[in-house]
Amino acid sequence: MENLSERFNVLQDQLMNIYETAAQTLEAQIEHWQILRREAVLLYFARQKGVTRLGYQPVPALMVSEAKAKEAIGMVLQLQSLQKSEFGKEPWSLVDTSTETYKSPPENHFKKGPMPIEVIYDKDADNANAYTMWRYIYYVDDDDKWHKSASGVNHTGIYFMHGSFRHYYVLFADDARRYSNTGHWEVKVNKDTVFTPVTSSTPPESPGGQADSNTSSKTPTTDTASRLSPTGSGERSQQTSTKGRRYERRPSSRTRRQQAQARQRRSRSKSRSRSRSQSRSRIRSRSRSRSRSESQSSKRRSRSRSRRKTSATRGRGPGSPTTTTSDRAARSPSTTSSATSQRSQRSRSRAGSSRGGRGRGGRRRHRLSESPTSKRSRRESGSVRLHGVSADAVGTSVHTVSSRHTGRLGRLLEEALDPPVILVRGDANTLRSFRNRAKHMYTGLFSSFSTAWSWVAGDGIERLGRSRMLISFISNSQRKHFDDAVRYPKGVDRSFGSFDSL
């Protein structure tokens, strides 16, 4: 207990020296985060041992200390990478390297030079919102090289240049839906109006366009349209952001797998509606046929009764006594009930025999119509892989090998058509870290990794969705072993595919 308290006090003294010195070097900032990491590890260990206080300092929960230690490790790795770049000699303060600055929009980027931006909605000075624009943004490209980019503001939002792409990390249209009634806003930089709202039919430029000289904060005042239409603003916001304001990307289009699933759902609903309509039509036809048969049987009964009456009158002759109503009532009820029961049994036996014949015949016809097709399909599917795969057919299949292939020859022939890959999607830094970790931990379970890349819109130059990375394999079995063994980072999803060649 005393040993832990002494070590904790030493770490506190080192932190106080750094705060008093306030050295603006990356070496001092890295040392600061190293001390914070050791402090979190010490508190974690103390909590594990049941210690709740170190002097006057209460010991937090294990999850809190673990999260702080991981945060410190991540900041140390980022600062060490920045130290190796050409920007390592620039002055860096504690504020510039704090987690609050690093996590603020644009998230997971180092930034310097905050500037206040005020946006007034509906020309009402009381209906205003404040934003922060950073003069310089530091980011890493796909080749792990650091770059320094200037930030700017226009009527659409606040952005920074990522190469030739304009990445918006604040969109005024998102807050205009909440704060504005007319869809108008004006942008002020240092209390000077930079963009005033005017009524115009020309829509504002879409995010992701090329940078021009009249949109940065250092340019003179210009007038431009910033009217928010109900449809256009929704489309612009959907095009520029997928995960809030984090990625400044357009959402990716639907994949072929999603489109195929949607088509399957439509076909299932159509087949269900058809089967329901067919069953209803069958029920109606059966009810109609029953009603017709009942009407015909009633007609036959009435005819037979009339014939019996006429034959009875003819047989009696003029001298025979007539039967009155009282005589009919005097007949025994047993004879009438037995006659009706015999009639009903005959009709049931006839209906059952006819129905049973139809059922047996229907089942027989169903088997006869079904068996040739199934046998033919089995013969065709079995005969496809009796031959080898031609050179032109290698790499042409886009489906994974199904489980119906039990032999090695069939599986090898199928895999020859399908050079497999895995496409992973997520944040660019997360994918790069995953690639570096997989190269050390899963050697031999893959062929190669690609760099992080993105799709670009066909109607613009903004990036679509999240970053992508491809992992290639020699065979499907190798891909399966890799997928079973690897643990994908949080927020990263995958999909399987193949190419003609790699």
Curated annotation (Swiss-Prot):
Which residues lie within the region annotated DNA-binding domain? 418-502
Its GO CC terms are: host cell nucleus
Matching entries from SUPFAM superfamilies are given as:
E2 regulatory, transactivation domain, Viral DNA-binding domain
Q: Where is the region Disordered? A: 195-388
Where does the record place Polar residues bias? 211-242
Q: After translation, how is this protein modified? A: Phosphorylated.
- Which residues fall in a compositionally biased region of kind Low complexity? 312-344
Q: What is its main location?
A: host cell
Instruction: Enumerate the Gene Ontology biological process terms.
Output: DNA replication; DNA-templated transcription; regulation of DNA replication; viral DNA genome replication
Q: Which HAMAP family did the record assign?
A: PPV_E2
**Subunit:** Binds DNA as homodimer. Interacts with protein E1; this interaction greatly increases E1 DNA-binding activity. Interacts with protein L1; this interaction enhances E2-dependent replication and transcription activation. Interacts with protein L2; this interaction inhibits E2 transcriptional activity but not DNA replication function E2. Interacts with protein E7; this interaction inhibits E7 oncogenic activity. Interacts with host TAF1; this interaction modulates E2-dependent transcriptional regulation. Interacts with host BRD4; this interaction mediates E2 transcriptional activation function.
Name of the protein described by the UniProt record: Regulatory protein E2
Gene source species = Human papillomavirus 25
Name the gene: E2
